[in-house]
């Protein structure tokens, strides 16, 4: 009996929560960003990336809106910015991501699909690829004819 007690005291206790549980509850964007980029374990990187993205788009109420916008404003990962521009709940977060994007393809997706007209029009105004602008011009937005007009205007601006 003494040996059993001694071994329980000298062997390290297993953490009551797994690393996955800790990541799933983590709300520290800086820590998650470091983990998703630098963790040795691929599974940890993937889980940290998923949690980071979920927090940025508003999938968890544990973060203030201002903190999410600030994190987007310093984000340098184009894939994350594209995801946030397409998926964030709040217009201000999508706009912060949109302002940092360099991808005309993502801008086109926003121009054609975002529920907020201001963001659709802003995306068109930021586009520089004539072929993709032509696509927006022809497809337009079913509820907003201004998108096609804006695309035509932007095409003319680029031709000058």
Give the label of every model feature segment:
Residues 1-160:
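Alpha-helical scaffold segments
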